[in-house]
């Protein structure tokens, strides 16, 4: 039996930096909410067997009505809602607990990366299916990055060694669960800012695959303006063809 690929779409945050009246995941982009776009991309990727949308309990009725209205509960693959926790890491753990499989591939995706190409999603999933325990999509860094203490520069890492990390990040579910349990039990003196950094701490090699400029995160009004400019020009249908 082939391994299932389950996508966790994180949509439980408030996203206050966007300055919208709704939580960020539900903000429309050309009339289509960000979370709807993200779920559609997972379905279109042709590698995902189930989508779990992680929401805040307060948004249960709204989210259920939204996904129903957009026909996502009657999609070709199952789509369901799971309540998240206070922080993103808590929400991811809630999502992992909702998956019965012990050998699945799990993709963890920010709903705010609403224009992520389905082909990139497939690329991440296939790299995990090929035997890698942790896979992240990355793009080169355009700016020079400085390490600072206070207001003083203390180092300039070589730009050629730096990458910006996107989502979805892909994992062997057993390995990711083990890393989460160890992190919760040991409470190390560092904050795992993404799931890959947790796996790094746990000692799991993390493979990088090519990301995509379209997978940018809609966090600020400027990000939203960029996403709107892209979709106002033309819906990015060219990106909806999964890669080989």
From Swiss-Prot:
Residue(s) at site: Positions MEP for the nucleophilic attack: 159, 217
Keyword set, alphabetical order: Isoprene biosynthesis, Nucleotidyltransferase, Transferase
Pathway assignment: Isoprenoid biosynthesis; isopentenyl diphosphate biosynthesis via DXP pathway; isopentenyl diphosphate from 1-deoxy-D-xylulose 5-phosphate: step 2/6
An MF annotation (GO) of this entry: 2-C-methyl-D-erythritol 4-phosphate cytidylyltransferase activity
Site note Transition state stabilizer, residues: 17, 24
Superkingdom in the source lineage: Bacteria
Signal peptide bounds: none
Uppermost EC category: transferase
Gene Ontology biological-process entries: isopentenyl diphosphate biosynthetic process, methylerythritol 4-phosphate pathway
InterPro entries named among the record's database cross-references: IspD, IspD/TarI, IspD/TarI_cytidylyltransf_bact, ISPD_synthase_CS, Nucleotide-diphossugar_trans
Catalytic activity: 2-C-methyl-D-erythritol 4-phosphate + CTP + H(+) = 4-CDP-2-C-methyl-D-erythritol + diphosphate
This enzyme's EC code(s): 2.7.7.60
PROSITE patterns with a match to the protein in the record: ISPD
HAMAP family: IspD
Protein's job: Catalyzes the formation of 4-diphosphocytidyl-2-C-methyl-D-erythritol from CTP and 2-C-methyl-D-erythritol 4-phosphate (MEP).
Sequence similarity: Belongs to the IspD/TarI cytidylyltransferase family. IspD subfamily.
Name used for this protein in its record: 2-C-methyl-D-erythritol 4-phosphate cytidylyltransferase
Gene designation per UniProt: ispD
């Amino acid at each position: 039996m082939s391994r299932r690929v389950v996508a966790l779409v994180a949509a439980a945050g408030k996203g206050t930096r966007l300055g919208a009246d709704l939580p960020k995941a539900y903000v429309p982009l050309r009339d289509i909410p960000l979370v709807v776009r993200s779920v559609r991309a997972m379905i279109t990727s042709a590698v995902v067997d189930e989508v779990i949308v992680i929401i805040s309990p307060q948004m249960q009725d709204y989210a259920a009505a939204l996904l129903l209205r957009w026909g996502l509960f009657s999609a070709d693959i199952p789509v369901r809602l799971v309540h998240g926790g206070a922080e993103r890491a808590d929400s991811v753990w809630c999502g992992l607990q909702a998956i019965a499989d012990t050998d699945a591939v799990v993709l963890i995706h920010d709903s705010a990366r609403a224009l992520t190409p389905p082909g990139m999603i497939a690329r991440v999933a296939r790299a995990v299916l090929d035997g890698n325990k942790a896979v992240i999509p990355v793009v080169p860094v355009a700016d020079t990055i400085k390490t600072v203490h206070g207001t003083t520069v203390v180092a300039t890492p070589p730009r050629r060694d730096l990458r910006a990390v996107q989502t979805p990040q892909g994992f062997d579910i057993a390995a990711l669960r083990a890393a989460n349990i160890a992190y919760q039990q040991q409470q190390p003196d560092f904050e795992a800012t993404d799931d890959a950094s947790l796996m790094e701490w746990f000692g799991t090699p993390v493979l990088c695959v090519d990301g995509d400029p379209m997978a940018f995160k809609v966090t600020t009004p400027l990000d939203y303006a960029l996403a709107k400019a892209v979709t106002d020009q033309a819906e990015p249908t060219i990106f909806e063809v999964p890669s080989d």
